[in-house]
Curated annotation (Swiss-Prot):
One of its GO terms (cellular component) is gamma-tubulin ring complex. Residues 453-475 are annotated as: Disordered. This is Tubulin gamma-1 chain. Belongs to the tubulin family. Its main location: cytoplasm. Interacts with Ote. Pfam families: Tubulin, Tubulin_C. InterPro entries: Gamma_tubulin, Tub_FtsZ_C, Tubulin, Tubulin/FtsZ-like_C, Tubulin/FtsZ_2-layer-sand-dom, Tubulin/FtsZ_GTPase_sf, Tubulin_C, Tubulin_CS. It is found in: Cytoplasm, Cytoskeleton, Microtubule organizing center, Centrosome; Cytoplasm, Cytoskeleton, Microtubule organizing center; Cytoplasm, Perinuclear region. Tubulin is the major constituent of microtubules. The gamma chain is found at microtubule organizing centers (MTOC) such as the spindle poles or the centrosome, suggesting that it is involved in the minus-end nucleation of microtubule assembly.
Length: 475
């Protein structure tokens, strides 16, 4: 039974990473840029229907909705060789085309005004699915459209489709660069509230860490947006391989995420990927014969902080720990090696886990696309729920407090209806994020379950019966 997923791309960043994601999916499924199945793509063991549907003339169309308040990025996509891939009825550009001016309040207000037109598209796409499982939302938390309009759409999706999963790929700003968006701390705080309350699962894409990895691991001096987005598309595509190349476990979104999220609030996920190679490495063959990849080698490297795509900062008190881990392993893998590797990791205590739950390391073995050549025998993606992610939220709180204390740049927000009478929404958002930090800090302690129950955040009330049976490694 298909479990279709609709992808929503919002704003400049969301549409850019979404575009790279669809390019990669087309490559992996043997679909041409115009949506036609290539002659060589006769494997037949993949499930294209999760992310694509077939038009009357049999060409494949992404289950994607492209939304923006200014035209530049979407015009670039629709002017590319992939222009015939998308359903033009699923592309929405605001008629005035002025954008949100990097202002969350403007993006949110415009989302509210345009909701009828936008949800006509989303509802039509949902109605065209046989068994819709949920939505994937791609956006940035720091700008105007992806953060503001994205927040509005997230809230409405949760209201309109309460039984469907909402997973986001959320890009966090680069902390090593001075932002030209002066209200970025406000935008981030307001978006984080919605990611906490409206999303079921948030994959954090931290630009600080992505740039560091591009420099340190891929040896790219000044990584471009395109190179970073390519890295993101790898994370997105590998995280969905078990849905597109299904086996007996982890073959739907709830089965993938349920073991990672023990309580509703703790749903922010980190990623790691290894081995990493850049296009230049492949072309110059710099990495030939450097390493023989094995399951243990890959799983061990995934636990190294330098491979994590979130910059959490030093853990001076050494109290942060893993809540759960899912490793998606691709390549030539003997299942017995997986069990041996898991045992080795446990015996050597390579990872520190929560004191109130089991050592939860899940492993999903996934086939790779037969149409894309890999340079490695084995590769792996880690999706991890780790308490140190709260340092990212603490950083956002500190930046917000500095700006809010001075009362800086608030006039831009007061112009919009949501802030016309007062600034309560900002303060409530701060409180939500502060509670989130406390929740993750509490998760490092043995008494976490009592803390969580007091707050009314018991174990996840799943949106699917499937999740109750997902408890062991898919190997």
């Amino acid at each position: 039974m298909p479990s279709e997923i609709i992808t929503l791309q919002l704003g400049q960043c969301g549409n850019q990473i979404g575009f790279e994601f669809w390019k990669r999916l087309c490559l992996e499924h043997g679909i041409s840029p115009s949506g036609v199945l290539e002659d060589f793509a006769n494997d037949g063991l993949d499930r294209k229907d999760v992310f694509f549907y077939q038009a009357d003339d049999d060409h494949y169309i992404p289950r994607a909705v492209l939304l923006d308040l200014e035209p530049r990025v979407i015009n670039t996509i629709m002017g590319s060789v992939y222009s015939k891939l998308y359903n033009p009825e699923n592309v929405y550009l605001s008629k005035h085309g002025g954008g949100a001016g990097n202002n969350w309040a403007s993006g949110y207000s415009q989302g509210e005004k345009l909701q009828e037109e936008v949800f006509d598209i989303i509802d039509r796409e949902a109605d065209g699915s046989d068994s819709l499982e949920g939505f994937i939302l791609c956006h940035s938390i720091a700008g105007g459209t992806g953060s503001g309009m994205g927040s509005f759409i997230m809230e409405r999706l949760a209201d309109r489709y309460p039984k469907k999963l909402i997973q986001t790929f959320s890009v966090f700003p680069n902390q090593d660069e001075i932002s030209d968006v002066v209200v970025q701390p406000y935008n981030s705080m307001l978006t984080l509230k919605r990611l906490t309350t409206a999303a079921d699962s948030v994959v954090v894409l931290d630009n600080t860490a992505l740039n560091r990895i591009a420099c340190d691991r891929l040896h790219i001096q000044n990584p471009s947006f395109s190179q970073i987005n390519n890295l993101v598309s790898t994370i997105m595509s590998v995280s969905t391989t078990t849905l597109r190349y299904p086996s007996y476990m982890n073959n739907n979104l709830i089965g993938l995420t349920a073991p990672l999220i023990p309580t509703p609030q703790l749903h922010f996920l980190m990623t790691g990927y290894t081995p990493l190679t850049s296009d230049s490495d492949i072309h110059t063959q710099q990495l030939v014969n450097v390493r023989k990849t094995t399951v243990l080698d890959v799983m061990r490297r995934l636990l190294q902080p330098k491979n994590m795509m979130v910059s959490t900062g030093p853990d001076k008190s050494n109290h942060h720990c893993y809540i759960s881990i899912l490793n998606i392993i691709q390549g030539e893998v003997d299942p017995t090696q997986v069990h041996k590797s898991l045992q080795r990791i446990r015996d050597r205590k390579m990872a520190q886990f929560i004191p109130w739950g089991p050592t939860s390391i899940q492993v999903a073995l996934s086939r790779s696309s037969p149409y894309v050549q890999s340079n490695h025998r084995v590769s792996g993606l880690m999706l991890a729920n780790h308490t140190s992610i709260c340092s990212l939220f603490e950083r956002a709180l500190n930046q917000y407090d500095k700006l809010r204390k001075r009362g800086a740049f608030l006039d831009q927000f007061r112009r919009e209806d949501i802030f016309k009478d007062d600034l309560n929404e900002l303060d409530e958002s701060r409180e939500t994020v502060d509670c989130l930090v406390q929740e993750y800090e509490a998760a490092t302690r043995e008494d976490y379950m009592q803390f969580s129950v007091k707050r009314g955040n018991g174990p996840v009330d799943s949106k699917s019966e499937d999740s109750r049976s997902v408890t062991s490694a898919g190997s």
